[in-house]
């Protein structure tokens, strides 16, 4: 009986979490990150403000509540995308192209995510986000290590991640971000980067 009550309680928590995610995504998309309030989000999700704060400390934390689950799944797909035998630049591009296509599906929310993740170090969702980001960087480092570059693979992986992050922000800032254009530009940048490692 206790196990049944526990599973019912767990399902209720997951349902509440999902209502909060959906409400925050809708209000951020419709009104913008700055205009949407925690109170509006709680009302839309049919939860009390205290319940909302159990899931996210502030609006920034809510952005990551919206994205962390999808970002984790997208990162799984991205890290499996490179094919053995591809040049390093193409392997890296295979990883990042998955993220471009995913973010292109929801550019308004993607802009908020990319704006808010700078210096995101505290909050209920922060550790999850940092874990996902580290998995991505570790995956990049693994590709760099296999390519046997002269420089320290960890340093090169960080450099690659910085190029990707800046390129992604540049692309998503356009009025209608087309993933094909963003990926094509990133390909050129990655080829330049890899050529500099020889």
What is the predicted role of each segment?
Residues 109, 151-173, 181-193:
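Hydrophobic alpha-helical segments that form the core
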Residues 13, 21, 63, 67, ...:
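Amphipathic, non-transmembrane alpha-helical scaffold segments
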Residues 65, 79-108, 148, 157-160:
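Hydrophobic alpha-helical connector segments
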Residues 101-138, 172-173:
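Short secondary-structure transition hinges
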Residues 1-15, 22:
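N-terminal intrinsically disordered/low-complexity leader segments
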Residues 72-76, 122-148, 154-158, 184-187:
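Amphipathic alpha-helical packing segments from all-alpha helical-bundle domains
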Residues 19, 23, 27-61, 65:
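Helix-turn-helix
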């Amino acid at each position: 009986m206790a196990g049944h009550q526990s599973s019912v309680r767990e399902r209720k928590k997951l349902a509440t979490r999902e209502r909060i995610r959906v409400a925050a995504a809708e209000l951020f998309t419709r009104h913008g990150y700055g205009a949407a309030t925690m109170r509006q989000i709680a009302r839309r999700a049919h939860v009390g403000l205290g319940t909302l704060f159990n899931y996210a400390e502030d609006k920034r934390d809510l952005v990551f509540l919206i994205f962390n689950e999808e970002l984790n799944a997208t990162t799984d797909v991205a890290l499996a995308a490179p094919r053995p035998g591809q040049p390093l630049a193409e392997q890296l591009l295979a990883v990042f192209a998955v993220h471009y296509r995913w973010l292109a599906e929801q550019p308004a929310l993607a802009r908020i995510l990319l704006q808010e993740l700078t210096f995101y170090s505290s909050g209920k969702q922060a550790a999850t986000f940092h874990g996902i980001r580290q998995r991505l960087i570790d995956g990049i480092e693994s590709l760099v290590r296999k390519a046997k570059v002269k420089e320290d693979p960890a340093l090169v992986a960080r450099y690659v991640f910085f190029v990707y992050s800046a390129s992604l922000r540049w692309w998503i800032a356009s009025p209608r971000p087309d993933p094909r254009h963003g990926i094509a530009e990133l390909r050129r940048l990655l080829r330049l980067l890899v050529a500099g490692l020889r």
